[in-house]
Structure formats: C-alpha cells, structure tokens
Amino acid sequence: MAKGKRTFQPNNRRRARKHGFRIRMRTRAGRAIVAARRNKGRKSLTA
C-alpha cells in the first residue's frame, strides 16, 4: 500500500502570514486568542 506524502512542509513566510501576530490583531477573535495566551502566561503568543 502506498502512503501519502508528508503533510507538513515547513515554510516560515506562510506560517507567519497564517498565524502571525499582525494577522491575529486584525480580528476581534484573533485579539481574544492573544489575550487568552497572555493571561495564561504563554512565553510565545503567536507563530
């Protein structure tokens, strides 16, 4: 049986554009995510 390809193909630009800080701050929900991570004391808030 043939297996599929690896699904994680790392790309720093795509990572930042999809999950980065500036993207998170654009929407109310994104700001809520950052706030929740701040309250929890996360060392890293976003990608």
Swiss-Prot record:
Keyword Ribosomal protein tagged: yes
Q: Does the keyword Repressor apply?
A: no
A Gene Ontology molecular function term for this protein is: structural constituent of ribosome
What's a single GO BP term from this record? translation
Q: Which UniProt keywords apply?
A: Ribonucleoprotein, Ribosomal protein
- Taxonomic source organism: Corynebacterium diphtheriae (strain ATCC 700971 / NCTC 13129 / Biotype gravis)
Residues annotated as transmembrane = none
Which protein family is named in the record? Belongs to the bacterial ribosomal protein bL34 family.
**Which Gene3D superfamilies does this chain map to?**
1.10.287.3980
Alphabetized HAMAP family for the sequence = Ribosomal_bL34
Name of the protein in its database record: Large ribosomal subunit protein bL34
